[in-house]
Design a protein with these regions (language model features):
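Bacterial N-terminal signal peptides
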Residues: 10-20
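Hydrophobic, often amphipathic alpha-helical segments used for membrane interaction and targeting
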Residues: 42, 168, 216-360, 375-376, ...
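Bacterial N-terminal signal peptides that target proteins for export
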Residues: 1-12
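Low-complexity, acidic interaction segments enriched in glycine
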Residues: 106-107, 111-223
């Protein structure tokens, strides 16, 4: 009997569908695949990701390496990717980012610089809130925020500590109190300030100070840290690693070549489909995410269920890339896949336009983005195929699933049939 695999199958289909919608939306492939699953006679199943190297047709310009990313994989995959990407001159990588993270172009007008500065102040407040949740205190300033945060967060803070006019952002605090149940309770809030276009305090118009303040915090205020996202919980359940936990993306030659969260949410909202729920689920904020997280904790406790789910997911990833099963999500696809691909190409064109001796540019993005990127780079930028290199991302022995060879074959057929019926 294979009925005991069905709950895992159903859960995996739900989770993988939502994860794919977030970053690796399936699309019709116009090129050879960027993922593949193979199995040895001994029952070892492996998922491999492709690095496709393109070279200029005319022989001039850098090579472009399209390197398939996957957000959860075995730790060894991320170690291999880290070593390989460090060899390249520039890396353009995937990751929907908070507003305010991009560099501010010094050629912008003052109004645009002011808007970009506000985004930075908002981001600093968000980071300070998470700092308080972890440390039960507010940071004493930007230096404290950097010194006592994990390297990835510290690098973000270091990149946004100046305003749009390249002046240091000022940190200040106000001590106050609120009345609660007839008692005064001491509170404090943090404020981040830019001195504006004139680089001096006060002023009017674009010269006016730009200040944003937090809500008041009390000394004993224990706020909850942000919930784990579905992808982190899925990684834990499958006993694999999460990309952001394993890879150091802070190299100055690495560029986050993706939309920011405000841009993505705005474009999704413009469709009128209420697609903010996708981001809430991936980030762990929705009720559905909490239910799935609860189920994943049970999977994580069972090595057999964990291995079974890992096998199912590997098959699904390869199957989704080679199919059009999610084609009815056409409007969402236009933003999550095609819109973000356009963003990558914009970043790539900026790098190609620079007068440098760059020899190799890597694009580290989800596999489903790659066929479209490859087509654009070949047709519009004058490139051609050079070579493929494959790297193992995940592996599982069928013996670890607790199923017989016949049951595993039946389960794989169930996956294919379930996807075809659902989509």
């Amino acid at each position: 009997m294979i009925h005991r695999a069905c709950p895992v199958l159903q859960l995996t289909i739900a989770l993988l569908t939502l994860s794919v919608l977030h970053s690796n939306h399936a699309a019709a492939s116009v090129s050879d695949p960027y993922t593949r699953v193979s199995e040895t006679e001994s029952g070892l199943v492996t998922l491999e990701m492709c690095e496709r190297t393109l070279k200029p047709s005319a022989g001039e310009g850098p090579r472009i390496h399209l390197i398939s990313a996957i957000h959860i994989a075995d730790k060894q995959f991320y170690e291999a990717m880290q070593d390989r990407l460090e060899l390249y001159d520039t890396v353009l990588f995937e990751g929907v980012k908070p507003a305010g993270l991009d560099a501010i172009d010094p050629e912008l007008d003052d109004e645009s610089k002011a808007e970009a500065t506000r985004d930075r102040l908002e981001l600093l407040l968000d980071i300070s809130d998470q700092f308080h949740a972890l440390n039960a205190r507010l940071p004493e300033g930007i230096d404290d925020l950097m010194e006592n945060s994990e390297p990835r967060i510290a690098a973000i803070v270091g990149s946004i500590r100046s305003d749009g006019w390249d002046q240091p952002i000022i940190t200040s605090f106000v001590d106050t109190s609120i009345s609660k149940n007839g008692e005064d309770k001491a509170t404090q809030y943090i404020t981040f300030t830019s001195t504006g276009a004139d680089r001096q305090r006060d002023g009017t118009g674009v010269d006016a100070d730009i200040s944003l303040s937090s809500e008041p915090y009390s000394p004993n205020d224990r706020r909850k840290a942000a919930p784990e996202g579905i992808q982190t919980q899925l990684a834990n359940a499958l006993r694999v690693s999460f990309q952001l936990d394993e890879m150091d993306m802070t190299n100055p030659k690495w560029i986050n070549a993706d939309m920011d969260i405000n841009e993505l949410q705005e474009q999704l909202a413009n469709m009128g489909e209420g697609d903010g729920m996708i981001l809430d689920l991936i980030e762990g904020n929705s009720f559905q995410a909490k239910l799935m997280g609860f189920a994943l904790k049970f999977v994580a406790r069972s090595p057999t269920m964990s291995s079974m789910m890992k096998l199912v997911m590997m098959d699904m990833l390869a199957l989704m890339e080679s199919s059009e099963m999610l084609s009815q999500f056409e409007e969402i696809e236009s933003v999550i896949l095609h819109g973000r691909n356009n963003t990558v190409i914009d970043y790539l064109n900026k790098e190609l336009a620079k007068d440098t001796q760059v020899e190799d540019i890597a694009i580290f993005y989800g596999a489903a983005h790659m066929p479209g990127l490859e087509e654009t780079i070949i047709k519009d930028l004058g490139y051609e195929f050079e070579s493929d290199t494959w790297t193992q991302a995940m592996a599982v022995s069928t013996e670890e699933t607790g199923l017989s060879a016949g049951q595993i074959k039946m389960m794989r057929n169930m996956i294919k049939n379930a996807l075809e019926q659902q989509f």
